[in-house]
UniProtKB/Swiss-Prot annotation:
PANTHER family to which the protein is assigned, alphabetical: SERINE/THREONINE-PROTEIN KINASE SAMKA-RELATED-RELATED, SERINE_THREONINE-PROTEIN KINASE SAMKA-RELATED
Protein known as: Serine/threonine-protein kinase shk2
The keyword Transcription is annotated on this UniProt entry: no
Reaction catalysed by this enzyme: L-seryl-[protein] + ATP = O-phospho-L-seryl-[protein] + ADP + H(+); L-threonyl-[protein] + ATP = O-phospho-L-threonyl-[protein] + ADP + H(+)
Enzyme class (EC, first level): transferase
Molecular function per GO: ATP binding; lipid binding; protein serine kinase activity; protein serine/threonine kinase activity
Entry coiled-coil feature ranges: none
Organism: Schizosaccharomyces pombe (strain 972 / ATCC 24843) (Fission yeast)
GO cellular component: cytoplasm; cytosol; membrane; mitochondrion
Alphabetical GO biological process terms: cellular response to starvation; intracellular signal transduction; plasma membrane fusion involved in cytogamy; regulation of MAPK cascade
Length: 589
């Protein structure tokens, strides 16, 4: 039956329709409590979700609804701590000047809770009226009569104009726009000497890392030199292959490969490069560099690495160095490894050498079947750092995703092994901070390991939260984009985004420019699947456990390892088919 509510035709299921499930998306028993009447007990109600409304009935046989909410009036759906399996709805009241009210709904189990939340939030978002709303006065952003942005710093206006964020979105969600601009501008205005950098690189390229590599054609890498702000237009899965690195002049510098550096690793001959005299502005940093360099010397092998390794060819390249395949020679004992991956880093290009030291230390200490094995490291002429690690000959998960459609059993296996590695790190108070398919490697046997510890951080007893902005934005948790304190659960969010990669071949918002992607993460929170009907309830439940906005309710790695979805993981050997299928298509040995 159709009723007109505030001029909008609303479908309210009748008892007859309810019995026949006509027009009903979902229905079921819930326990209800209104926020404004917290002193009253929870009451049992029959909840019915239709295409554009949510109705509450006294019972499953009631003829008419006690309360009907328009989905477009629902402002937020979130977990609540009032009961174990409980969520809260925030909505506009139709009787009290459209003020925001709330109610809490409790259900039988966790999966049912997430299913209700997913169905309501996705349909509420789709039913929003597209007309602009008045901007919030506490956020100083607006548009004047001539269509110009007002109330923003000039630099932010330039960023906004370069992005694909619309003026209507600025009016509707000014807070999310401010958060995105503030986050992005801080990366432009801050050098890597004072903040950890982050990357909009969406390719399997090693960055300022000592541990990751991929099998790529280096000649296909794009060079990017842009002054000011560049509007990015991403139209295909083949993503930009350049890490954005910025200085105070807002210049995005290209990666220029040092030819002498390449020659040195391929031939074993190292060319000395004159070191510029220290200026007053860099003296204190150089002192820190010397200290880090001294510690590096103490932690590496002093012998000439050329005696032990026969470098074959380049595997991958990043903004800070290259990764090479090498054969172990000269009687060097590296356990079962006869082939290794060598990451060569030019330390003169690294403004924060202590980060490299931290990365090596974490990797050396993180001995686990699901973490790439660190083998050795060498410092050549106090400039080139060679980090030797096990060679994962099947490449990255990104390569697999691009060539093959994964089954849920295969996704479960990859999630299980990745969760084990994450749990190992979290148990030692280490956050990876850059979990994504690029940083999950496989070998020909189907073994799965986490790599790239360039962004990792340690938490202490006194400091169990961080606020630094690192990682790859498309995989970032909302609390990082909003610059709130965060902990180990940012890795769980990134794992959830990686699951969407495995389902849909790419993370959410990949085709958006970076500023708009940050805006959408801040605005939308939990992303929605493009075709949720093709995904099983068990996988959706696991995904929701990873992508809960409220970190209190977001699962830990240990909790995920007990989830029933992982019970359907295929044997490791079953991954061989997609590995060799991908190799056959790309002619990789």
């Amino acid at each position: 039956m159709l009723l007109s509510v505030r001029g909008v035709p609303v479908e309210i299921p009748s008892l007859k329709d309810t019995k026949k499930s006509k027009g009903i998306i979902r229905s079921g028993w819930v326990m209800l409590k209104e926020d404004k009447m917290k002193y009253l007990p929870w009451t049992k109600k029959w909840l019915v979700l239709s295409s554009n409304s949510l109705s509450i009935y006294k019972g499953s046989k009631s003829e008419s609804a006690q309360v009907t909410l328009l989905l477009k009036d629902i402002q937020k759906v979130e977990r609540s701590k009032s009961r174990t399996f409980c969520f809260k709805l925030r909505f506009k009241s139709s009787t009290k000047n459209f003020e925001i009210q709330a109610c809490e709904l409790s259900v039988a189990d966790n999966m049912e809770c997430y299913e209700w939340m997913d169905l309501i939030s996705s349909r509420a978002l789709a039913s929003k009226v597209s007309s602009p709303m008045n901007p919030k006065h506490q956020v100083h952003v607006g548009i004047d009569n001539e269509g110009n942005y007002v109330g923003l710093p000039k630099e932010w206006i330039l960023l906004l104009q370069s992005s694909s964020i619309t003026k209507q979105e600025c009016m509707e969600e000014p807070k999310a726009v401010i958060q995105a601009l503030d986050f992005y501008s801080k990366q432009l205005d801050t050098t890597s000497e004072t903040k950890d950098s982050f990357s909009f690189c969406k390719e399997t390229l090693p960055r300022s890392s000592t541990t990751s590599y991929s099998i790529r054609d280096a000649d296909k890498h794009h060079k990017l030199t842009t002054s000011g702000v560049t509007k990015m237009n991403i139209t295909e899965r083949c993503k930009p292959k350049t890490t954005i690195q910025t200085d105070k002049k807002h210049i995005i510098r290209p990666f220029i490969e040092d030819k002498s550096h390449v020659e040195s690793i391929m031939t074993g001959k190292v060319t000395k490069v004159p070191v510029k005299a220290d200026s007053k502005n860099t003296l204190s940093r150089r002192m820190t560099d010397r200290q880090a360099l001294a510690m590096l010397k103490d932690s590496v092998t002093s012998h000439d690495p050329v005696e032990y390794f026969n470098v074959k060819h380049k595997l991958g390249q990043g903004a800070s160095g290259s990764v090479y395949l090498a054969k172990v020679v000269g009687g060097k004992q590296l356990g079962i490894f006869d082939s290794v991956a060598i990451k060569s880093i030019d330390l003169q290009c690294q403004t924060r050498k202590e980060l490299i030291l931290n990365e090596i230390t974490v990797m050396r200490e993180s001995i686990h079947p699901n973490i790439v094995t660190y083998l050795d490291s060498f410092l050549v002429r106090e400039r080139h750092l060679w980090v030797v690690m096990e060679y994962m000959n099947a490449g990255s998960l990104t390569d697999i995703i691009e060539k093959s459609k994964l089954t849920e059993a295969q996704i479960a296996r990859i999630c299980l092994e990745t969760c084990k590695g994450i749990q190992h790190l979290h148990a030692r108070n280490i956050i990876h901070r850059d979990i994504k398919s690029d940083n999950v490697l496989l070998d020909n046997s189907g073994n799965i390991k986490i790599t790239d510890f360039g962004f990792c951080a340690r938490l202490s007893n006194r400091t169990n939260k961080r606020v630094t902005m690192v990682g790859t934005p498309y995989w970032m948790a909302p609390e990082v984009v909003k610059q709130n304190e965060y902990g180990t659960k940012v890795d769980i969010w990134s794992l959830g985004i990686m699951i969407i990669e495995m389902i849909e071949n790419e993370p959410p918002y990949l085709r958006e420019d970076p500023i708009r992607a940050l805006y959408l993460i801040a605005k939308n929170g939990t992303p929605t699947l493009k075709k949720p009907n093709l995904v099983s309830k068990n996988l959706k439940s696991f995904l929701n456990s990873c992508l809960t906005i409220d970190t209190i309710f977001r699962a830990t790695a240990a909790e995920l390892l007990t989830h029933s979805f992982l019970n359907q993981a295929c044997p490791t050997e079953d991954l061989k088919s997609i590995i060799f299928s991908r190799k056959a298509n790309t002619h990789i040995n």
